[in-house]
Amino acid sequence: KHFFYYYLYILKLKSNKMRKYIYPLIIFLFASKAFSHTSHYEGLKKIEMDVVRNGEVIGYTNYYFEKEDDIMTVKNYTKFKVKLMGVTVFSILSEATEKYENDNLIYFKSNTFQNNKEKYVNLNYDKSLKKFIIDGSSYKGEASLDCIIGNWWNHKIFTSSKQISPLSGSIKEQIVTFIGKEKININNKEYLTEHFKLKSKNQNLPDDKKLNF
């Protein structure tokens, strides 16, 4: 069994009565395989992730895989809440579907409620243009084929220079840094992990628009 972990930083959560807070979360991923190409996921049925804050599981993001001929379909269900003194300050409820043909993304659709605000993405591959066409809550237009969906199941997220937000469709250039291999202990069992950091290339973006994982 392979094991990975990611630090997810929510940089800015604001209300009229709140200061700026930083909430470190850890996403734990358990799977029998984890590779950089979709063809390597053959035989894999699901990847389950726990979202953990301060040692407590506060939600999940789970992926389910289906393969038929040359088409692989990935379905995602995500739900978690961050609470401060009993008050929910950040929440995600999301469903998404990705489709790949011969390892190439051809379709993506998601519906998300982030802090009860609705977001969405509809993406299709245009064969004549050889580009992605995106209709999203934050972006509508074209995207080059070197963009990937910013979902954690796909190891390509660590090799790509651009990602498409799975929540809103916005395109962000990113810088990926491999921090190193680390050993962590969970439930009295030791795991060798790989620790990466993802940041937005454009540091002039507002904090709530930046990548900082």
Region roles according to the model:
Residues 3-9, 30:
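Aromatic (phenylalanine/tyrosine) cluster motif
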Residues 42-44, 111-205:
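Solvent-exposed helix/loop surface patches that form functional interfaces
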Residues 1, 12-14:
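Polybasic, lysine-rich low-complexity intrinsically disordered segments
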Residues 75, 91, 193-213:
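Gly/Pro-enriched, hydrophobic low-complexity segments
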Residues 14-21:
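Positively charged n-region of N-terminal signal peptides that target proteins for export
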Residues 45-127:
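N-terminal mature ectodomain segment of secretory-pathway/periplasmic proteins
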Residues 21-30:
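Sec-dependent N-terminal signal peptides
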Residues 34-38:
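Boundary at the C-terminal end of the N-terminal hydrophobic targeting segment
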